[in-house]
């Protein structure tokens, strides 16, 4: 009788034990994203995020604060002397968030171009991401002149390694490439003011 109860308890315990294998529900990969217009729109929305970190008082200091047009008093040192190659401060933010924006745009362009959504929507969203990418590169070339230029989605270590070793491309060549890229988008975006576009989009 005792053996019966032990076997019954053991069987109940084995059938009630938890499984270590879980179905992931809240994690997306590029392979299972970009399936709907909403997902593609979300990817383009993410391209705007770095702008809020670029357009702060730091941009004012990095552009006007180092010229004769503005003097910024500092309690410890002249703020003009606070920006240098050895201590880039706000320049480092421009570089970091500028390239973060480029990375988001490249990811969105690649993902949406391979998306099964309606062609008109796809072309419009790709064009919007390309406009934002061009804007980020415009800011980068305005601040730093010659910068590394790439349009690849940094989706794996091989691409990341190649992009990390890119030399600087001349600002003129970068802007020429951007103009060609933007000209390819002309038919995909509405010819209206941004304030009249849905959601004030590009």
Predicted features, each with a name:
Residues 155-163:
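Short glycine/proline- and charge-enriched loop/turn segments
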Residues 31, 57-78, 150-152, 190-202:
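Short, surface-exposed recognition loops and adjoining beta-strand edges that mediate ligand/DNA contacts
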Residues 37, 41, 49, 75-144, ...:
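Conserved, well-structured interaction surfaces
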Residues 23, 141-153:
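Short, well-structured active-site flanking segments
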Residues 18-63, 97, 107-109, 172:
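Acidic, glycine-rich segments characteristic of secretory precursors and extracytoplasmic regions
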């Amino acid at each position: 009788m005792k053996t019966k109860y032990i076997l019954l308890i053991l069987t109940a315990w084995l059938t009630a034990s938890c499984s270590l294998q879980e179905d992931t529900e809240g994690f997306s990969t590029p392979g299972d994203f970009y399936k709907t217009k909403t997902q593609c729109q979300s990817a383009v929305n993410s391209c705007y995020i770095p702008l809020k970190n670029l357009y702060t008082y730091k941009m004012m200091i990095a552009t006007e604060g180092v010229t004769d047009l503005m003097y910024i008093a500092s309690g410890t040192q002249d703020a003009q002397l606070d920006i240098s190659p050895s201590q880039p401060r706000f320049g480092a933010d421009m570089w970091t968030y500028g390239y973060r924006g480029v990375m988001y745009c490249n990811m969105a362009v690649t993902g949406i171009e391979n998306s099964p959504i309606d062609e008109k929507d796809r072309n419009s969203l790709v064009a919007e991401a390309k406009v934002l990418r061009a804007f980020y590169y415009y800011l980068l070339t305005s601040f730093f002149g010659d910068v590394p230029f790439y349009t690849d989605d940094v989706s794996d270590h091989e691409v990341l390694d190649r992009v990390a070793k890119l030399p600087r491309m001349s600002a003129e060549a970068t802007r020429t490439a951007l103009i060609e890229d933007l000209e390819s988008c002309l038919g995909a975006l509405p010819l209206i003011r941004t304030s009249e576009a849905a959601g004030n989009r590009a």
